Amino acid sequence: MPREDSRSQSPVSRPSGDRHYRDRSDPPKRKHNSDGASHQPYRKKVQLPKKEHQYPSVNELKKRIRDVKRLLNRVDLPADARIVQERALAGYENDLEEEEKRRERSKMIKKYHFVRFLDRKTASKDVKRLERREKEVSGSDLDSAAKEQKLAALAQKLRVARVNLNYTIYYPLAERYIALYADAKKKKEMVKDGNNDEDGDAGYTLVHANAADKPAMWHTVEKCMKDGTLELLRDGKLKNGESGAVTKEKSNVDKKKTSIRDSVQQKDTTKTSVKPQRREDKNAKDSRGFSSKNDSRHSRARQSSPDDNGDESDGGFFEM
């Protein structure tokens, strides 16, 4: 076959259905990066804008309060401007108090979060265990009298366990949490006897076993369960016994502070009263010293007077 005829032939020598065949006129499907080609830049992560702090700054509020107080101390401030600044001062002080309470509340939540979690876990297990036991007793073939007696005892225990659970959940978040359960190691006697509890909370025991030993908040939670005000108690919107105790402690502290101030004032008054006495004593000493000097002079003059009455004379005016 001549060479020219071979050039004029179509390059398509394979069926078009062959997927491995590619016409040279088509662009390549796979793009190979050459060594000199620049790589695409790395796509940066999209950073979302930070959420604005919705709570006011304590330092900013304190600064505003100081500025308003300085402004109110001015004598030439107009009456209408003074009224506006007094209202602004009351609002700033209220905002500052609320912000400090919120920060104290969040601090207490972080501090006692893990203790509350452990107590809630243990109390929920106790409730489930007693509920299972109650179902078993109710479905057992016991005498009616014995069954009622056991069910009554279980109902009492279940009520206490539910109060314990609500205590761990609805304890006021802004107050110091008092734990109900203590992490106690198993005694050696239990290990020797080989008593293996099915539950994992065998090492946790109730600190306040009797109702009399329980904290005052436990009885408050029990009362709130009847009234249906547990949410209000958790948010600190109810007045409970512990808050009253806190107010009493604060009042005692205030009384101590006032007594200290009174004692300091009394000391100052005594100091001021003692100083003039000392001055008077000094004056008295000076007067005594002056008088003693005069007395000494008079005594010397008296001692010298008999000598002057002698025969010798200096030749006076009336002397003959």
Swiss-Prot record:
Residues 57-111, 145-166 form a coiled coil. The keyword Cell membrane does not apply. GO terms for biological process: maturation of SSU-rRNA from tricistronic rRNA transcript (SSU-rRNA, 5.8S rRNA, LSU-rRNA). It is found in: Nucleus, Nucleolus. One of its GO terms (cellular component) is preribosome, small subunit precursor. Keywords: Coiled coil, Nucleus, rRNA processing. Residues 1-59, 241-320 are annotated as: Disordered. Residues 16-28, 247-270, 277-298 have a biased composition (Basic and acidic residues). Pfam families: Efg1. Belongs to the EFG1 family. Involved in rRNA processing. This is rRNA-processing protein efg1. The gene is efg1.
